[in-house]
Amino acid sequence: MKEESIFLDYVGDSPRMRVLQYLIEGRGLDYTLTDMLNARVSWGTLNTLIPKLLELKIIIKTRKIGRATLYKINKDNVLAKQLIELYDKLIMENLDSMKIKIPA
């Protein structure tokens, strides 16, 4: 079943944006490639995207656990900051529009 996402509706539903949304939603944590499969992208696509995102410094390697490398969104990157701000604004707008006004 396909989940609805305000962020993906706004920026486009592509594998790259799905991975970035996944990392933005859990921006305080770091993730393995296997974890990132939860963003609904294939293993092959993920292995193509990660080197490009690292090259652009949108994501960074954080640590290794055994053979697994962990990654997270690079909050110091200008583009990543803008995507995070956009994500947060879209979520807040959506929450504001969902508020039900109750007469006093």
Show where each model-derived region lies.
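Long, low-complexity, charged/polar intrinsically disordered regions in eukaryotic proteins
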Residues: 1-4
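A short, conserved structural fragment
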Residues: 54-64
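Short amphipathic alpha-helical interaction segments
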Residues: 41-55
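Amphipathic alpha-helical dimerization/coiled-coil segments
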Residues: 78-104
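N-terminal helix-turn-helix DNA-binding core of bacterial DNA-binding proteins
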Residues: 15-41, 69-73
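Short, cationic-aromatic polyanion-contact patches
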Residues: 6-16, 62-86
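Residue-level detector of family-conserved "landmark" positions at structurally sensitive sites
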Residues: 33, 46, 63-64
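N-terminal secretory signal sequences
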Residues: 22, 27, 52-53, 100-104
